[in-house]
């Protein structure tokens, strides 16, 4: 291997090595599963959109919304199917963020006559590349 090829190889190796050592930022990934129906029937799409715009967007600093078809069974064995909205929210682990999420869930439950909202929290490392 001539010196030019070796120099190019070394340069590429150093660049890739530096890239592989990017700092990982520890965050919390919260998933919120909102059922979009209640005892009166499906929650109108316009009502969900208004709640999302007026409450969620003013509470969380950013999120991703996914839509799904949910299935669940209550304690007596009765089965239910409903549309759902899933919010994914990446945030710093803090009491303030926990309070914001708890407040959002409480407001949703009151406004749409819901028993619960499923919440899943995971510690994650995030990277912007």
Model-found features: residue ranges?
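Bacterial Sec-dependent N-terminal signal peptides
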Residues: 1-22
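Positively charged, small/polar-rich N-terminal and surface patches that mediate targeting and assembly
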Residues: 18-129
């Amino acid at each position: 291997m001539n010196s030019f090829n070796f120099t190019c190889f070394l340069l590429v190796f150093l660049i890739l090595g530096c890239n592989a050592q990017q700092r990982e930022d520890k965050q919390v990934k919260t998933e919120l599963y909102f059922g979009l129906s209640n005892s009166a029937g499906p929650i109108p799409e316009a009502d969900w959109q208004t709640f999302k715009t007026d409450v969620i967007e003013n509470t969380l600093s950013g999120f991703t919304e996914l839509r799904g078809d949910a299935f669940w069974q209550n304690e007596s064995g009765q089965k239910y199917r409903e549309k759902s909205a899933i919010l994914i929210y990446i945030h710093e682990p803090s009491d303030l963020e926990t309070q914001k999420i708890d407040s959002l869930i409480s407001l949703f439950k009151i406004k749409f006559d819901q028993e619960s909202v499923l919440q899943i929290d995971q510690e994650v490392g995030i990277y912007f590349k």
